Amino acid sequence: MRISSILFISMVLPVILTKCGESEDAVSLANTYMTDPEAVKRGRLLFVGTCAGYCHKLTPERVDALYLFDCDWKHGSSDQEIFNTVTTGVPNTRMLGFGTNFPEGENDLWKIIAFIRTNSPQCS
């Protein structure tokens, strides 16, 4: 019994700790970009050319894509949830997963999130 418990803990604990570290690093990266005007500018350009160019708009309009600059988020509202939604998409919707298919990979996606955050109201 004791060996089984030790084995279980030694297998599960590293996975849990790894996942906790990933989320923390990712959120701090988005926060870092929010204080960098060049990163926010690049995020805006990427948003306009990728997201707003096809579905999402910079102003609330009657389109079938969600408006992203308010506090009403349907598919998660944390930075990590937004990252996951853009990366994997939303099943049974037009929101396809982009993966990390941006010129600078994940960094560009975090810059898009920083742009959205800096142009949205403070949500509780």
Regions found by a protein language model. Give the residues of each.
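The canonical Cys-X-X-Cys-His
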Residues: G43, F47-L58, I112-I116
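Bacterial N-terminal signal peptides that target proteins for export
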Residues: M1-L7
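Gly/Gly-Pro-rich "capping" loops immediately C-terminal to redox-active cysteine motifs
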Residues: Y33-V40, R44, K57-T87
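C-terminal motif of bacterial Sec signal peptides marking the signal peptidase cleavage site
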Residues: L17-K19
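Sequence contexts marking disulfide-bonded cysteines in secreted/extracellular proteins
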Residues: G21, A52, H56, Q122-S124
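Axial heme c-ligation environment in periplasmic c-type cytochrome domains
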Residues: V63-D70, T87-S124
